[in-house]
Amino acid sequence: MKKILAEIAYDGSMYHGFQIQPTKPTIQGEIEKALMKINKKKIKIHSSGRTDKGVHAKRQIITFDININIQLNNLKKALNAILLKPGIKILKLKHVKNSFHPRFNAQKRKYSYCILNSDNYYPWESYQAYYVNKKLNINNLNQMAKILIGNHDFTTFSCIKDKSKSKFRHIHSAKFKKKGKYIIFEIIGSSFLWKMVRSIIGTMLDIEIKNESISTFETILKSKNRNLARTTAPANALFLDKVYYE
């Protein structure tokens, strides 16, 4: 039995999240079905984390054990032949130690959020972006982003259904970048609470759109009160960019 690590990318718009659900299409479900076609036996995959319904990934990490003798390049081609139509692609395969776990061995995770901040765009450019009509001040947004850096209790930006014992998370970096008609928010953290990034983005944008003070965001963060968080930004503009390992 060999353990294989796979880097995968996917369009989350067609799926009800990563984690398998009996009656709904999911990323995990599609990959496990593809593996079963090749292996002829059920294979369970493990991931670095579970993305929500509608969220995309540029480089999600999964592992699985396989007992057939097949070259990695041939396995990659076979999987992509099955998966590309449902919007999932295997980017890379490699062998790893049996002790490796994509979630527990992960050191950091990077997410990005794409904001379309221009009236000059084609309709399809908004499919994986959040359209904001008002011209945003990137300096104001970056002042709020700086407040996130460090170790904080993110109860305010957690979902009531999140079962994490601790709401403390360490944020290594958080910044907004202008990229043509888009503003991209990039955040790197040890890990994230359920819907945390989208709640943060929605709150920062609401404060900026309403011309409220930067200090409002810090007050909301420190309140540890979910009711003070603003609108949760939509999932279609969120990407899991990268998972970092030692």
From Swiss-Prot:
Residue numbers annotated as active site: 52
Positions annotated to bind substrate: 111
Chemical reaction(s) catalysed: uridine(38/39/40) in tRNA = pseudouridine(38/39/40) in tRNA
Isomerase among keywords: yes
Molecular function GO labels: RNA binding; tRNA pseudouridine(38-40) synthase activity
Assigned EC number: 5.4.99.12
Gene Ontology BP annotations: tRNA pseudouridine synthesis
Keywords assigned by UniProt, alphabetized: Isomerase, tRNA processing
Class of the enzyme per the UniProt entry, highest EC level: isomerase
Signal peptide: none
Family: Belongs to the tRNA pseudouridine synthase TruA family.
Assembly and binders: Homodimer.
Known role: Formation of pseudouridine at positions 38, 39 and 40 in the anticodon stem and loop of transfer RNAs.
Name recorded for this polypeptide: tRNA pseudouridine synthase A
Organism encoding this protein: Borreliella afzelii (strain PKo) (Borrelia afzelii)
Gene symbol of the encoding locus: truA
